[in-house]
């Protein structure tokens, strides 16, 4: 058993040309390295879908592009006709409103007279502090109920 591998997930051998990675994250024999390891102009086929058009085709796959993001985006974005649906809530038919009757203008408001200033509250004298509690004496133990009722 290799160190760091749990028994629930045994390490499976990775064959040549396999797209899987081993648990340690090393590329299999058939995979081309990506990123900094790749040569800029190498002639080997790269991972990803084949190029559809020329260099300027926006839908063509980039080197190292699996195309999965573009496929998922194409499947998950609804068309505008699907996105704007009439609501299923039945609406009451609109009743035409009566035309508004113009009202006569209001008289201008008379500003209120300022209120009288409040009389400040006179604070009461604080209460005298309570005397400290004196602990009571414990009560004598009571006799059991059975003997009390018979006497």
Swiss-Prot record:
Principal subcellular localisation of the protein: host cell
GO CC, alphabetical: host cell cytoplasm; host cell nucleolus
MF-aspect GO terms: DNA binding; protein serine/threonine kinase inhibitor activity; RNA binding
Subcellular location: Host nucleus, Host nucleolus; Host cytoplasm
Keywords from the named record: DNA-binding, Host cytoplasm, Host nucleus, Host-virus interaction, Inhibition of host autophagy by virus, Inhibition of host innate immune response by virus, Inhibition of host interferon signaling pathway by virus, Inhibition of host MDA5 by virus, Inhibition of host PKR by virus, Inhibition of host RIG-I by virus, Inhibition of host RLR pathway by virus, Interferon antiviral system evasion, Late protein, Phosphoprotein, Repeat, RNA-binding, Viral immunoevasion
Domain of life where this protein originates: Viruses
Comp. bias regions, Basic and acidic residues: 49-65, 95-151
Subunit structure: Associates with RNA derived from the 60S ribosomal subunits. Seems to form large heterogeneous polymers of up to 200 identical subunits in the cytoplasm. Interacts with host EIF2AK2. Interacts with host NCL. Interacts with host RIGI; this interaction prevents RIGI binding to host MAVS. Interacts with host IFIH1; this interaction prevents host IFH1 binding to MAVS.
Name used for this protein in its record: Probable RNA-binding protein
Organism: Human herpesvirus 2 (strain HG52) (HHV-2)
